[in-house]
Curated annotation (Swiss-Prot):
Name of the protein: Anthranilate phosphoribosyltransferase
GO BP annotations, alphabetical order: L-tryptophan biosynthetic process
Source organism per UniProt: Cereibacter sphaeroides (strain KD131 / KCTC 12085) (Rhodobacter sphaeroides)
Taxonomy of the source species: Bacteria, Pseudomonadati, Pseudomonadota, Alphaproteobacteria, Rhodobacterales
The EC number(s) this enzyme carries: 2.4.2.18
Cofactors named for this entry: Mg(2+)
Source superkingdom: Bacteria
Amino acid sequence: MSDRLKPLIGTAATRPLSREEAEFAFECLFEGEATPAQMGGLLMALRTRGETVDEYAAAASVMRAKCHKVRAPHGAIDIVGTGGDGKGTLNISTATAFVVAGAGVPVAKHGNRNLSSKSGAADALTEMGLNVMIGPEQVEACLLEAGIGFMMAPMHHPAMRHVGPVRAELGTRTIFNILGPLTNPAGVKRQLTGAFSPDLIRPMAEVLSALGSEKAWLVHGGDGTDELAISAASKVAALEGGQIREFELHPEEAGLPVHPFEEIVGGTPAENAQAFHALLDGAPGAYRDAVLLNAAAALVVADRAADLREGVEIATDSILSGAAKAKVALLARLTNAA
């Protein structure tokens, strides 16, 4: 332990840290050079004042540099949310990932266990028979053979072991709730990323731009979820060509009906997995339409679809042809053989 972080704790409470100062601070955290009290002090100073784009970008760049990296195919996309919306929905981003992969777009999905629902991405995948506790080489093999791979955050970010206990003791949101979607170990350049607050979508888009993303949609559902909503309009900050455009998106713009929010509320991992299987078998309803909407957006971000309506058509074919379901079966086989 050292006192190198100490001066920056007081600074962080009174003014934004520069990119260089923030990088130094997070180097101290990730190298285990700070005491738990110092870590907590820095995290709460940032949270109380409000983190800046430079601070997000600095923390994300240090975290990316220290992760166990994965080589992904060209054009790979991540489909992920911050979690923390407290809405307990069915596993929409997870199902979306398989639908998009079934449409021929490589998906390098970064995720963890439950945060905002009773069943996070890793919980749902485990319930469906996939082994999520695999390392970078196995994930790369999955991406090459199946066109989809799941990167369990703790398996790829060993430096987080230093801050994990502090986060648990604080018991409140910190900058790390935002960093997950910004620190994909495969370094993908395209993202469909949901945020638990509409106030985060533009800053997160600015961070992804600073970190080299080519095209990304940062979204917040009008129903309060960290994905495009099927029950209301959603806010979007779209990054493309270094420019950010903000707009609202309604399900009907994609040719989809509006459904009551209650129809996408999830349950236990087993119940969510059952709904997931039914969706892959073609069951209609709010869950499928929510997945189609998010898949359509991902296909636009991946340049696989020209617009949302075409994206819905492609995503529908991925489900009804059995392509999305086949991806689940293949990934289950590959991860359990690892």
